[in-house]
């Protein structure tokens, strides 16, 4: 129905103009004005989507398919903002979980000894 309406809008004015003035068919600026039809009021989703895809660059099309960008934002940037500047170290969390599982209630690990030594070390200040 919609393509038929667009075709009717394109052909209608040209048929009316040529039927009234068969003698004067000049291809100038005036002749082109009756051929132009404004279709801004009629949205066609499939045409709009194809135009948007054509306007995007090749890299944006590729990364859109691969899921690298979501809604114009890069996923890495969002994750980095959420986690802070250090990020998340999977290796470190796995090691900590494994050492906590192996440690007995009374056992002392090397990391805990180092942190205790740092906490108990006296702070030296100088008055100059």
From Swiss-Prot:
Any single biological process term in GO: mast cell degranulation
Signal peptide: 1-16
Function as written in the Swiss-Prot or TrEMBL entry: Tachykinins are active peptides which excite neurons, evoke behavioral responses, are potent vasodilators and secretagogues, and contract (directly or indirectly) many smooth muscles. Hemokinin induces plasma extravasation, mast cell degranulation, muscle contraction, salivary secretion and scratching behavior. Increases sperm motility. Induces potent analgesic effects and may play a role in pain modulation. Promotes survival of bone marrow B lineage cells and of cultured LPS-stimulated pre-B cells and may act as an autocrine factor required for B-cell survival and proliferation.
Annotated protein name in UniProt: Tachykinin-4
Family (UniProt): Belongs to the tachykinin family.
Location within or outside the cell: Secreted
PROSITE patterns named among the record's database cross-references: TACHYKININ
Gene Ontology molecular functions: receptor ligand activity; signaling receptor binding; substance K receptor binding; substance P receptor binding
Residue numbers spanned by region Disordered: 96-128
Residue numbers of Methionine amide PTMs: 66
TM region positions: none
Propeptide intervals in chain numbering: 17-54, 69-128
Organism: Mus musculus (Mouse)
InterPro entries for this protein: Tachy_Neuro_lke_CS (IPR013055)
Expressed in which tissues: Expressed in hematopoietic cells with highest levels in pre- and pro-B cells but not in later developmental stages. Also detected in uterus, skeletal muscle, brain, spleen, stomach, skin and lactating mammary gland and in cells of myeloid lineage including dendritic and microglial cells and macrophages. In uterus, highest expression is observed in non-pregnant diestrus mice and in day 5 pregnant mice. Compared with mice in diestrus, decreases 2.6-fold in uteri from non-pregnant mice in estrus and 10.2-fold in day 17 pregnant mice. Detected at sites of chronic inflammation such as granulomas.
Keywords carried by this UniProt record: Amidation, Cleavage on pair of basic residues, Hypotensive agent, Mast cell degranulation, Secreted, Signal
Entry GO terms, CC: extracellular region
Keyword Secreted applies: yes
